[in-house]
A protein has these predicted regions:
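A short, N-terminal amphipathic alpha-helix
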Residues: 65-76, 108
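Glycine-rich anion/phosphate-binding loops
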Residues: 21-23, 54-68, 92-102
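Short, acidic (Asp/Glu-rich) active-site segment that either coordinates a divalent metal cofactor
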Residues: 40-43, 148-205
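A generic local secondary-structure boundary/capping motif
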Residues: 19-21, 29-30, 105, 119-129, ...
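Short beta-strand-loop/turn "lid" adjacent to the catalytic site in phosphate-handling enzymes
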Residues: 78-89, 93
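Glycine-/charge-enriched secondary-structure boundary and capping motifs
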Residues: 2-15, 57, 90-116, 121-135, ...
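Extreme N-terminal cap/leader segments of soluble proteins
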Residues: 1-51, 55-57, 81, 85, ...
Length: 336
């Protein structure tokens, strides 16, 4: 049983129709009706050893803990308003917490997002020693009623787009885990993509009324594209040669490039669909948001995700996104 089957089996009971919950489960955010607005609500959990390495810079961790939630709001096209923080710590470390909170507040201030409450506790010890540091953030955003993006609106004929570049975060993690060896200069270029991802909030807002479906790429391009395909009841064809890569990843062997870009995760870019007649508007919206976007495929009738090479042929090796319950115990990738 993978994590999505777990959710579907145990935690997917249809909500009671009260008129308040407009969308619950299956998307990056829940949507709550509030007059002419909707509140977008998301929550993400970060566990030491699973989502981040113990030696991570605490300021970077504070940034990322909030960034992964703001990325979900961006995928919904919502403007961040506030967040709640719950944390479990094995011990009090004032200097560590000073740095963590500084990183957290710096990103919050950049998006006018207020810490509105939370909870703290001590992490229970485990057989190997101290329990892991654990952080859970719930973020709340706002979007005009009826303008939120979901995963279910893609239609045959739409084009598939992605923001920024993919795979740098996975490459940095592979180096930190000893799987590849990067030069210090190369690591300095890709490590911020792993530890300080930039949520594409401005782009998400700019795509209101343009994107037909949207998701943030947290678990890998192939896996997250599959969520759009399943939710929309369509097939996504991805031209892997068109997937944008950074210069460091682009210089790596092909198999490593594909693994990082298609299945690595931790990118926190926006993957979205839009009709071809909106191409100029999409590019203008991206330019206004200060983010590059690339067309990487198309939507067809059918189901699933088809990964194609430069000649338009299916890749021999297919790639899946990150799955918490399929990964080995040493995996430290994200998967929010």
């Amino acid at each position: 049983m993978n994590e999505f089957e777990l959710i579907a089996r145990y935690f997917s009971r249809p909500p009671r129709d009260t008129g308040f919950v407009a969308q619950a489960g299956g998307d990056d955010c829940a949507l709550l009706n509030l007059g002419d607005r909707q509140l977008a609500v998301t929550t993400d959990l970060l566990v030491e050893g699973r989502h981040f390495l113990p030696e991570v810079d605490p300021a970077a961790l504070g940034h990322k803990a909030l960034a992964v939630n703001l990325s979900d709001l961006a995928a919904a096209g919502a403007t961040p308003r506030c967040f709640f923080l719950a944390l479990a710590l094995p011990r009090l470390e004032p200097e560590w917490l000073d740095a963590f909170s500084a990183g957290l507040y710096a990103l919050a201030d950049a998006h006018d997002c207020v810490l509105a409450g939370g909870d703290t506790t001590r992490a229970a010890p485990v057989a190997q020693g101290e329990g892991p540091r654990t952080f859970c953030i719930t973020a709340v955003g706002e979007v005009p009623a009826g303008q939120a993006h979901g995963r279910g609106g893609a239609r045959p004929g739409d084009e598939l787009w992605v923001s920024g570049s993919l795979g740098d975060a996975a490459l940095a993690l592979a180096h930190l885990l000893g799987e590849v060896a990067l030069t210090p200069a190369a690591l300095a270029q890709v490590r911020p993509r792993l530890e300080r991802p930039q949520p594409r909030v401005a782009l998400g807002e700019a795509l209101r009324g343009l994107a037909t479906a949207c998701i943030d790429v947290s678990d890998g391009l192939a896996g997250d594209a599959a969520h759009i395909a399943a939710r929309s009841g369509v097939q996504l064809d991805i031209d892997t040669a068109a997937v944008p890569l950074g210069t460091v990843l682009g210089a790596q062997p092909e198999r490593l490039r594909l693994r990082c870009a298609l299945a690595g995760g931790d990118d926190y870019e926006l993957l979205f669909t839009a009709p071809p007649q909106r191409q100029a508007q999409v590019r203008a919206a991206a330019q206004a948001a200060g983010v590059a976007v690339s067309r990487i495929g198309r939507v067809r009738a059918g189901q699933g995700v088809h990964l194609l090479d430069a000649a338009g042929q299916p890749l021999v090796a297919q790639w899946r996104g990150y799955d918490h319950f399929a990964a080995g115990p040493s995996t430290a990738a994200s998967g929010s």
